């Protein structure tokens, strides 16, 4: 249970018991990262149900759906998105990009990209129709994005070989962790397809394409992954999944 509490304490603002961060507990902590996504998905489902019950309009519904994950996670992943945007926007050599990721200052690229991202994600949520199976497909998105992020962390090289991400990956049994996280990914994908085959297929495709982009970008630009890059991927993946649900719903109407 200590690994679970460490994962929840690290990747969310949810109140959990304080435990010692020993090597044994850290070795399994990343495997519980998707649990935070499950909690966010449940809260998201409650919010969307409340919006439907009270006939709340798309703007307020979208604002809540956008802000809820940020509030629960403490914006830790959005911070990584901003740091990565600064690094990519600098067009500097790899070593300099890694230094920018560690810089606590916020640059112009981070502010611009963050604003554009939030506007885009808000607009996408406004277009989503949380009805039928697609409703619950949307709620599985946060768990799938975190499963893929964790899988990348324990499968791909660490760009720095140190840092917060290394705190979790160095003590772990990488093979066992990969098995657990692959099972998380399979479970989330299977759940999406079972809930709504059409919307689920689009959503899974969006998540996997985001994962492929993450692999190519992180390798070419940084030589591996970091915690900030993981946050960048997670934000991109979640926006892509909601966008895919919107596309699935629109195409289904045309057919």
Q: Residues of each region from the PLM?
A:
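Hydrophobic alpha-helical transmembrane segments
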Residues: 1-74, 92, 96-98, 103-255
């Amino acid at each position: 249970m200590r690994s679970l509490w460490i994962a929840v304490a690290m990747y969310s603002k949810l109140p959990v018991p304080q435990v010692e961060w020993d090597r044994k507990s850290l070795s399994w902590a990343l495997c519980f990262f998707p649990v935070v996504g499950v909690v966010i998905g449940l809260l998201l489902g409650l919010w969307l149900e409340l919006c439907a019950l009270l006939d709340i309009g798309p703007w307020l519904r979208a604002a809540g759906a956008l802000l809820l994950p940020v509030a629960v996670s403490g914006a830790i992943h959005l911070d990584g998105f901003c740091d990565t945007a600064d690094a990519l926007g600098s067009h500097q050599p790899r070593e300099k990009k890694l230094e920018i990721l560690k810089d606590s200052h916020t640059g112009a690229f981070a502010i611009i990209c963050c604003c554009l991202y939030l506007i885009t994600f808000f607009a996408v949520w406004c277009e989503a129709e949380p009805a039928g199976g697609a409703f619950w497909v949307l709620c599985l998105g946060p768990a799938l994005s975190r499963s893929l992020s964790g899988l990348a962390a324990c499968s791909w090289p660490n760009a720095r070989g140190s840092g917060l991400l290394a705190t979790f990956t160095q003590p772990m049994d990488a093979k066992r962790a990969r098995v657990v996280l692959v099972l998380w990914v399979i479970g989330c994908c299977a759940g999406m397809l079972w809930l709504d085959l059409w919307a689920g297929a689009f959503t899974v495709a969006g998540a996997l394409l985001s994962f492929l982009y993450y692999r190519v970008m992180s390798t070419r630009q940084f030589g591996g992954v970091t915690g900030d890059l993981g946050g960048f991927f997670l934000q991109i993946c979640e926006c892509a999944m909601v966008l895919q649900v919107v596309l699935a719903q629109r195409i289904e109407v045309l057919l």
